[in-house]
């Protein structure tokens, strides 16, 4: 169980997770196409859980994406099928579609029960799970239902572990709080790292935003193609984007090129070769990059080449 916590940003709680002897885990995603490489981090983590004996359920969140203005249900189901084809190259998971779940009255009963135990302020605070600021949700009341539905997903599926990026933290913490009030199983939250936008975060001084909201605001996004490496990008596109990416010397925090190396390539593609040095752990690369042993140019060259190799295995 300890090894399953490698390349994990946070687990709530570690003790609860280590007490598990198998069980079930879930992740929900809005079906968009093309996906970016940030999705691969949680996909590989799900595959590790599956290999360790967990029942892994992937919720293709069509209704959630529709609420979030990402397209019609029909379009979203079609996108979901394409995403599944990529995920099938990483692991074999059970899939559930949000619009199928929404046909069950018991699901909506859960949504209402969760709403009864949650303040409006708490719901608004949980909206960064949508990739939106809390102030944006007042444009459309349905968006306030999104966090409630995400919590209902966890209880409806009856899973032990809720998996997601750090941007999903508030919804998962809401689920843990509400579980106690409703007498339901409290889910363990397992949060994987987020890859920052290739353009960086800009000046964040004085924003006073919580870390999960920062992740939601500055992560890679398919809607901003130059901020992300897309699964459909050509080798030329990948190399151009990496060479143009924000990658300050001696700085690893919110450095997207370092994050790609440490969170995706080294754990799931293999050791990274940089100028005769072989990095088998992200910590070793972090140390050398911070000390200037590895330069931004050297890091970009190695990351671009390794990333092209990884994506070649996943393209449809």
From Swiss-Prot:
Superkingdom of the source species: Archaea
Annotated catalysed reactions: tRNA(Tyr) + L-tyrosine + ATP = L-tyrosyl-tRNA(Tyr) + AMP + diphosphate + H(+)
Biological processes, Gene Ontology terms: tyrosyl-tRNA aminoacylation
InterPro entries: aa-tRNA-synth_Ic, Rossmann-like_a/b/a_fold, Tyr-tRNA-ligase, Tyr-tRNA-ligase_4, Tyr-tRNA-ligase_arc/euk-type, Tyr-tRNA_synthase
EC number: 6.1.1.1
Keywords for the protein's UniProt record, in alphabetical order: Aminoacyl-tRNA synthetase, ATP-binding, Cytoplasm, Ligase, Nucleotide-binding, Protein biosynthesis
Motif 'KMSKS' region mapped to chain: 219-223
NCBIfam families in the cross-refs: PRK08560.1, tyrS
Main function: Catalyzes the attachment of tyrosine to tRNA(Tyr) in a two-step reaction: tyrosine is first activated by ATP to form Tyr-AMP and then transferred to the acceptor end of tRNA(Tyr).
Family: Belongs to the class-I aminoacyl-tRNA synthetase family. TyrS type 4 subfamily.
Subunit architecture: Homodimer.
Name listed for the protein in its UniProt record: Tyrosine--tRNA ligase 2
Source species of the chain: Pyrobaculum aerophilum (strain ATCC 51768 / DSM 7523 / JCM 9630 / CIP 104966 / NBRC 100827 / IM2)
Gene: tyrS2
């Amino acid at each position: 169980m300890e090894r399953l916590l490698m390349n994990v940003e946070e687990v709530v709680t570690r003790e609860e997770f280590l007490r598990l002897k198998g069980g079930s885990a879930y992740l929900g995603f809005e079906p968009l196409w093309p996906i970016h490489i940030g999705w691969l981090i949680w996909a590989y983590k799900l595959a590790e859980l599956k290999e360790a004996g967990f029942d892994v359920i992937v919720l293709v969140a069509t209704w959630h994406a529709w609420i979030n203005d990402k397209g019609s249900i029909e379009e979203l189901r079609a996108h979901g099928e394409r995403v599944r084809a990529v995920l099938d190259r990483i692991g074999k998971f059970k899939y559930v579609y949000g619009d199928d779940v929404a046909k069950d009255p018991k699901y909506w009963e859960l949504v209402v029960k969760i709403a009864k135990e949650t303040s409006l302020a708490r719901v608004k605070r949980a909206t960064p799970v949508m990739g939106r600021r809390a102030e944006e949700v007042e444009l459309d009341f349905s968006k306030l239902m999104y966090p409630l539905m995400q919590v209902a997903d966890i209880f409806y599926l009856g899973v032990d572990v809720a998996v997601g990026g750090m941007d999903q933290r508030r919804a998962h913490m809401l689920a843990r709080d509400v579980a106690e009030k409703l007498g339901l199983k409290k889910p363990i939250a397992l949060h994987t790292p987020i890859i920052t936008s290739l353009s960086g975060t800009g000046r964040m001084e004085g924003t006073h935003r919580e870390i999960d909201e920062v992740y939601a605001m500055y992560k890679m996004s398919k809607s901003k193609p130059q901020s992300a490496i897309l699964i459909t990008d050509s080798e030329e596109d990948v190399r151009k984007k990496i060479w143009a990416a924000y990658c300050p010397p001696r700085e690893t925090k919110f450095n997207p090129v370092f994050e790609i190396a440490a969170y995706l390539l080294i754990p799931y593609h293999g050791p990274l070769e940089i100028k005769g040095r072989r990095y088998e752990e992200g910590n070793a690369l972090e140390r050398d990059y911070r000390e200037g042993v590895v330069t931004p140019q050297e890091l970009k060259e190695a990351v671009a080449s390794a990333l092209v190799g990884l994506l070649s295995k996943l393209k449809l």
